[in-house]
Swiss-Prot record:
The modification Pyruvic acid (Ser) is found at S96. It holds the Pfam family SAM_decarbox. This is S-adenosylmethionine decarboxylase proenzyme. Heterotetramer of two alpha and two beta chains. Belongs to the eukaryotic AdoMetDC family. Keywords: Autocatalytic cleavage, Decarboxylase, Lyase, Polyamine biosynthesis, Pyruvate, S-adenosyl-L-methionine, Schiff base, Spermidine biosynthesis, Zymogen. Is synthesized initially as an inactive proenzyme. Formation of the active enzyme involves a self-maturation process in which the active site pyruvoyl group is generated from an internal serine residue via an autocatalytic post-translational modification. Two non-identical subunits are generated from the proenzyme in this reaction, and the pyruvate is formed at the N-terminus of the alpha chain, which is derived from the carboxyl end of the proenzyme. It comes from the Eukaryota. Binds 1 pyruvoyl group covalently per subunit. The gene is amd1. One of its GO terms (cellular component) is cytosol.
Amino acid sequence: MPILSTEIFNEADAGFVYQSNSNDYSDGFEGPEKKLDIRFGPISKGSVKSIAGSPSKVGLRTIDKEKWQTVLDSARCTIISQTSNDHMDSYVLSESSLFVYPRRAMIKTCGTTTLLHLIAKMVQVGKECGLEVEMVVFSRKNLNQPSKQVFPHCSFSDEVNFLNKIFDGQAYVMGDVNKDHWNLYIADFRKNPTLQRTEQTFEVMMHDLDETVMKQFFKREGVSAWDTTVNSGIADLLPGSMIDDFQFDPCGYSMNGLLNEFYWTIHITPESHCSYVSFDTNVALADYNQLLAKVLNVFKPGRFTAALYAEDGAPCGDPYTAFDVNVPSYAIQNKTVHGFDGGYDVVVSNYQQLDKKVNFSNDDLIQSIESTNIDLIQV
């Protein structure tokens, strides 16, 4: 398997040095998240760990909250709350979310967290469950203040170099590197990549939010997180969900939603000078036009990026047409499409509200991108 074992890989030996996480948010909180999606397969026949008498507690779901916290310590975030259903375990974190399936873990962290530093522990946890890594997907939108991040998250090229010391993957930049864009790294070790797979994920990353809307996400006496979830319209986005929500003090909001085997999550940074909202789900829809319209109606962003990952056989069909290019009240800035040999496609589109002029903040330096393998189709 093309991955360094946890016995020989550690950050110090590889020349990686932890820096102090000062949480310097004087110029605004860094809302855009780093996202790590790791899928596992059995090391051998019958190797996957299970808990007797608990049919749903298989593989990664046999790991308890305390053990997950030791993994998350490497990313410098903590578990706030936990919910579960028959399909997965959900954790709201101090900086975003963790979702755990029997053979998959999806972690999102914002701020100055060090998400990639937890990979070695994730690999070890998988081994303890009789699992090995089959696929790794790391992604993030461009950051507002990359210079305040902790290595390797100051630039995408540093992140790619870090990942390539562990995996043999490929890196892509989707969108205009001078404006809003999406960074993507994929390492695919699946033994049967041509088999039909049906996973799809949809993300909406929003900036320049309506200030009246954002006022709801400042903590107020006598107003609970659930009150905010209902009053804002979040509860109506995917009805029938189990929702775990949290209101931060003095401001900020996170929620995880479970809808049968699907997750969805929202994270909100409401301050006007750095406002940001993310919506992320793997709910299986034939198209995302209605859901996208509902999300935009709730938050009213000045600009947003929509990203769709879809495998062959996914309900959305051709991801290129899964959400409408012509979004009412918004002008599309660019659309980037990439098809992968493993049988999946990614579409990323950037939109700007028609009556708003956008001033972009400092982005990852272009020269830090040029050292990566950029492979895209601009349409």
